Design a protein with these regions (language model features):
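Secretory targeting and sorting signals
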Residues: 1-29
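Recognizes extended acidic, P/S/T-rich segments that occur
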Residues: 717-748, 763, 821-859
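Short glycine/acidic-rich loop motifs that flank beta-strands on beta-rich extracellular proteins
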Residues: 93-94, 318, 345-351, 393, ...
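Beta-strand-rich modules
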Residues: 744-765, 855-874
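Pro/Thr/Ser/Gly-rich low-complexity, intrinsically disordered linker/stalk tracts
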Residues: 680-714, 749, 765-816, 860, ...
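Extracellular polysaccharide-degrading/modifying enzymes targeting complex plant/algal/animal polysaccharides
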Residues: 41-400, 405, 451-455, 678-681
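Extracellular beta-rich repeat passengers
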Residues: 165, 171, 343, 347, ...
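Right-handed parallel beta-helix
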Residues: 332-343, 382-384, 402-416, 425-440, ...
Length: 888
């Protein structure tokens, strides 16, 4: 495995800063007087029969180094360093640590890179011997093949440091859902090989225009394997299918499931968005298919790629490093510094359990999971506690541990969550590290299986996640989050930069959903958690109903010890939700001095308080003050919710410079921004997603979600291609992000068209594969104008006004709204200013969604009459009045 020196230098600096004096511990040999500490030397070219006493006598494996450490650490009077030389350490078995591997007498066992080294702890199996198979794709591209170990489970493959894509595509037949799966319109899929390898994917997110979405809620993307295909009958794997389509409904007329989180079944009439992992789908460069039964990998190379000479890794180990203690005997005082963890996988989604999702990587599992798991007091036979669903594992995981630290490390090319610090994790530190190209969550902290631990050692308390760069995570299980926290106490999440995530950036809390049925949120031990000074942008790039910071459940016993969210800078959160999202049961939260702009919504929202003695007549206590935002909520103090002294801004230039500059990585950690392990040779960006189309006269409008996973190849433009005819329109990326649609002219009225989109880079050879095609739309005359927006209003700031409206109703079969004209007429001078508001919200939002825009640079003391009008392909519709306001 190759790793650039630039990456290693940046990480080495971060590791040294984060580790502080710990990294400078004494480094005498393993056999030296333990009063001065000791060093155990490890090298991929070492010998496990050797002593590890010096570099010339290095041991080979981490497990042998572990044995040497155990022989030294019973009476430590100095730190023990396990120094890893340059190279790759293949983990056929995980490094499994327990209390015997702990530091003692106040000292630490430090697993660290040797000076200048770039060690990689790998769960991969290298694949070599690629050769042309003699077969080609439908476009004539050569398929290459190589032998691989038969029966070895894997879902991910990496080539020269970049992630290959599993073979996937549109479902090639029309499906009708049945109790056990589907009836297909033809027997085409019955001829496909290895049907049990195939998965259907059900994408959530926001549906609009021609796009219909499903999932188990807009925040999810479940997937289920196929069990068999016979003729036109497709039988889905159990229990995934029943857990995803038969979730039990309440009988109280609430229309809710017993789990209170999402719907009873996958949406969009239970139709999958795409199909994945069949050799017959192998079409696009960069795609692979691993036939575990035959022991073969098939791959379509990217332009210029030479598989025979590439470093190809199948991710095969589920756990690389684990630390497991008990409440009475925790594993403790162990540090990891300057290491890279790569090539882990996770096998549950490939099993009959599939990925039957609830939220944030938690799934329902087991034969009766849909009817019992985590349903506790709400259904007979429900297991306790409420909300205890199956947690996504971490490829690096600890539980019942104390003072574990990860500093200056890289978590990348992983197939589950990156790092899981589970129940009983106490006073751990994650600092100065990089998390990217991870299939699931970046960092997991705590769990949801023990809301009120009875034993001190079971509490998750005092952990710090600071100064990390977390980006392009959740690239396979795209409902994942950058940092996910369950029930935890006195947590500090500060000075991280989190960007380019498909769903929520930070999620904290659990168990608030019972307020949907006027029942109290689940009592839990959480308190004293702080989320401060983080820089979060370009989150929510794919799914919806989340936020930059998503919270739920009880967070303390008062505002004094409840959750504190302060000093965060949050911008360009794409899909619908809230930049700071107080979801069900969010109680005792203080939200102050945050800077928020270019978001669909900045903050929301209060919920009824049903924790006794409250009866829902008041809300969960919240304090929202001194924020700088564009939403512009008026000051209020009612029902236990205070909203006060917040400032409307036009952008970051209107917020205090000290707040804006302080957010994100502190200066000494900003070298992490140059670390991108995804910049492998030949990498290309992931394809755009969720393409939707709307017809105009002789034209069509095409919208799509932008690429959030560019594999180190920044997207500079997007190309839309029409079929039939091949008409193409290319638009640069910044222009697209402003309007969120591409106009494709020169089409023939009365002809049905579909459209695909590619993400382009500065190099013509590095464009992505095309997106899935849109549904067909038929151009034709468009004459109907949109109606006037509803509920227009304005909130006044200092030189700014936040104008709100509900989107216009659009007649069926006519063009949807594409933008909005906000017009201000100065009542003193008669000057008229019109600002055209464009973007994802304006394109997507329906008439039930509050939409807003800020207009800046207005004259103090002047009165302005404000109107809002929708614009579609036919022109500008009638305006709605937002009233006359005087600028402060």
């Amino acid at each position: 495995m190759r790793r650039s020196r630039r990456v290693a230098l940046a990480l080495g600096a971060a590791a040294a800063l984060a580790a502080g004096t710990t990294a400078a511990a004494a480094s005498t040999s393993a056999g030296s007087d333990n009063h001065r500490g000791a060093t155990v030397f490890v090298s991929p070219w070492g010998d496990d029969h050797d002593s590890g006493a010096n570099p010339g006598h290095s041991v080979r494996t981490l497990q042998r180094a572990q044995q040497v450490v155990r022989s030294l650490d019973s009476a430590m009077s100095g730190d023990i360093r396990v120094e890893l030389a340059d190279g790759t350490y293949s983990m056929a078995q995980p490094l499994a640590l327990d209390s015997r591997d702990s530091g003692t007498n106040g000292h630490t066992v430090i697993w660290t890179a040797a000076p200048g080294a770039h060690p990689v702890i790998s769960g991969g199996t290298r694949v070599s011997g690629f050769h042309p198979s003699g077969q080609t794709t439908s476009s004539g591209a050569q398929i290459w093949s190589a032998p691989a170990p038969a029966g070895l489970p894997s879902r991910e493959m990496f080539i020269d440091g970049h992630r290959a894509s599993r073979a996937s595509g549109a479902v090639p037949v029309t499906l009708t859902a049945t109790a056990t799966g589907y009836t297909a319109s033809s027997d085409l899929m019955a001829a496909w090989g290895n049907p049990t390898d195939i998965e259907f994917v059900y994408s959530g997110g926001d549906g609009y225009w021609s796009l219909s979405t499903g999932g188990l809620g807009a925040w999810t993307e479940p997937r289920c394997p196929i069990a068999s295909v016979s003729g036109t009958t497709i039988t889905m794997a159990e229990p995934c299918w029943v857990n995803s389509t038969q979730r039990v409904m309440r009988t109280d007329g609430s229309g809710r499931t017993v789990n209170l989180v999402g719907p009873a079944s996958v949406g969009n009439h239970e139709l999958p968005t795409s199909v994945e992992n069949a050799r017959e789908l192998l079409q696009q460069p960069g795609q692979f298919y691993y036939d575990a039964k035959a022991g073969r990998v098939d791959y379509v190379p990217l332009p210029g790629e030479k598989p025979a000479h590439a470093d190809v890794e199948l991710a095969t180990a589920q756990t690389l490093v684990s630390g497991s203690g008990t409440a009475e005997a925790p594993v403790h005082d162990i540090a990891f510094s300057g290491l890279q963890f790569s090539y882990g996988t996770w096998n549950q989604p490939s099993s009959n359990e599939g990925f039957s999702e609830i939220q944030a990587g938690y799934t329902i599992t087991g034969a009766n999971g849909y009817a019992t798991q985590g349903l506790c007091q709400f259904i007979p036979g429900g297991t306790c506690p409420f909300g205890d669903w199956t947690k996504e594992p971490g490829n690096i995981s600890f539980n019942h541990d104390q003072r574990i630290s990860f500093t200056g490390d890289v978590f990348t090319h992983l197939g589950a969550a990156g790092l899981d610090l589970g129940d009983g994790s106490q006073n751990d530190t994650v600092q100065g590290s990089v998390f990217t190209d991870i299939s699931g969550n970046g960092v997991d902290l705590g769990g949801v299986d023990d809301p009120m631990p009875a034993v001190a050692g079971d509490h998750t308390v005092g952990n710090q996640i600071t100064d990390n760069h977390i980006f392009s995570t959740s690239v396979e299980y795209r409902s994942g989050v950058g940092i996910d926290v369950g029930y935890a106490e006195n947590t500090l999440i500060s000075h991280n930069q989190i960007d380019h995530t498909p769903y929520t950036a930070i999620s904290i809390g659990w168990g608030g959903w019972p307020d949907k049925i006027k029942a109290p949120a689940i009592a839990n031990s959480s308190h004293g958690n702080v989320i401060s000074d983080n820089l979060i942008y370009d989150a929510m790039q794919y799914l919806a109903d989340g936020g930059a910071i998503y919270t739920q459940g009880i967070t303390g016993s008062s505002l004094a010890d409840g959750e504190q969210i302060s000093g965060n800078v949050i911008h360009d959160i794409l899909d619908h939700g809230h930049a700071i999202y107080c979801d069900n049961g969010s109680t005792f939260m203080t939200i102050t001095s945050n800077v928020e702009y270019n978001n669909q919504n900045d903050w929301g929202s209060p919920h009824g308080d049903y924790v006794p003695p409250a009866d829902g007549s008041t809300d969960d206590p919240l304090d929202v003050e001194h924020n700088y935002w564009q939403q512009g909520d008026k000051d209020s103090n009612q029902k236990n919710v205070v909203v006060a002294a917040n400032t409307i801004i036009g952008g970051p230039q209107d917020a205090p410079r000290t707040l804006v500059d302080a957010a994100g990585l502190e200066p000494r950690y900003r070298s992490l921004l140059s670390v991108d392990p995804g910049r492998g040779r030949g990498a290309v960006p992931a394809a755009p997603e969720q393409a939707a189309a709307s017809a105009g006269e002789g034209s069509a409008y095409v919208s799509f979600t932008p690429t959030f996973f560019d594999q180190g190849r920044p997207v500079t433009a997007y190309t839309v291609t029409a079929s039939p005819g091949g008409k193409q329109v290319r638009v640069d990326a910044p222009t697209y992000l402003k309007s969120f649609y591409v106009l494709v002219p020169g089409l023939t009225d009365g002809t049905a068209y579909t459209f695909t989109v590619t993400a382009d880079t500065a190099r013509a050879s590095e464009s992505s594969a095309p997106s899935l095609p849109t549904r067909a739309v038929t151009p034709g005359p468009t004459t109907a104008l949109p109606a006037a927006p509803a509920s227009a209003s304005a909130d006044v700031g200092v030189g700014d006004v936040s104008v709100h409206w509900n989107p216009a109703t659009v007649a069926h079969g006519t063009s949807p709204s594409l933008s909005y004209d906000v017009t201000l007429t100065d009542q003193k001078t008669g000057a008229v200013t019109t600002v055209t508001e464009t973007g994802k919200t304006e394109v997507w939002a329906t008439n039930g969604r509050d939409t807003f825009a800020v207009v800046s640079g207005l004259t103090h003391g002047d009165a302005y009459a404000i109107t809002v009008a929708a614009r579609n392909a036919a022109g500008v519709g009638p305006a709605a009045s937002a009233g006359v306001v005087t600028i402060g």
